[in-house]
A protein has these predicted regions:
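Short helix-capping/linker turns of helical repeat alpha-solenoids
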Residues: 7, 14, 27-30, 43-45, ...
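Hydrophobic face of amphipathic alpha-helices that form TPR/SEL1-like repeat modules
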Residues: 2-9, 36-43, 72-79, 108-115, ...
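Canonical positions in the second alpha-helix
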Residues: 24-25, 60-61, 96-97, 132-133, ...
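TPR/TPR-like (Sel1-like) alpha-helical repeat modules
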Residues: 215, 219, 228-242
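N-terminal segments that cap or nucleate solenoid repeat domains
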Residues: 1-36
Length: 242
């Protein structure tokens, strides 16, 4: 029997079947099975939620350098799930996963260092971790890296690089990046002022329910910037933005 059938069953939300395949594999020391079993206990998928059991299986997988388990342990400490909230422990587990190349862990470290969660704010460290995740295509990291370049935090202010990283995240559909990119085009920061492109990116973010983008798009319709003046559409966008 393919021991990885538990992953397929889990993805299909067939938790009884996943447990059938997962339990014996986990007990035989398979780190991926141990992670999935921990996840099932953690979230109550097919089992009664049990944080103690979740941590037990996550730890077994983490000892074998399973990145998902390391991140899950970090998140348990970060959120105080079944343990006392401990940012230092969370950061330590994120660092282990990040050093194994996990983009989500790298992004989360960037967030912790940029926001000062359990540590002194350090924009240089934040930039380093965001960059590692961004280079792996992680949209939220690309967006945050763009913000650091725009504000000159941890790096020399560079509007061109701010645009570059916002663009990468925006093209992946990340609404906050689309909104920021639209503002950059609207203001002409690092790019030639371009109301057509501003409208394009405000519109993409607005379609995802981004309230500020909807409000800005309404403003463009009122003024006729980058689009033909259209008061009816302006009112429609304004209503959506609340």
């Amino acid at each position: 029997m393919n021991k990885k059938l538990f992953g397929v069953s889990f993805a299909q939300k067939k938790y009884d079947l996943a447990l059938k395949y997962c339990q014996p594999a986990a007990e035989q020391g398979d780190p991926e099975a141990q992670y999935y079993l921990g996840l099932m206990y953690n979230k109550g998928f097919g089992l009664k939620q049990d944080y103690t059991e979740a941590m037990n299986w996550y730890l077994k997988a983490a000892e074998q350098d399973n990145k998902d388990a390391l991140c899950s342990l970090a998140n348990m400490y970060l959120e105080g799930e079944g343990v006392k909230q401990d940012y230092t422990e969370a950061r330590n587990y994120f660092i282990k996963a990040a050093n194994l190349g996990d983009a989500a862990a790298q992004y989360n470290l960037g967030v912790m260092y940029s926001s000062g969660d359990g540590t002194k704010i350090d924009y240089i460290e934040a930039k380093n971790w965001f960059l590692k995740a961004a280079e792996q295509g992680q949209a939220k990291a690309q967006f945050n890296l763009g913000v650091l370049y725009f504000n000159g935090q941890g790096v020399k202010q560079d509007y061109f690089k701010a645009v570059e990283w916002h663009q990468k995240a925006a093209e992946q559909g990340y609404a906050d990046a689309q909104y920021n990119l639209a503002k950059i085009y609207y203001l002409g920061k690092g790019v030639k002022q371009d109301f057509v492109n501003a409208k394009k990116w405000f519109e993409k973010a607005a379609k995802q329910g981004h309230a500020e983008a909807q409000c800005c798009l309404a403003g463009l319709y009122i003024q006729g910037l980058g689009v033909k003046q259209d008061l009816m559409n302006a009112k429609k966008m304004a209503r959506k933005s609340g």
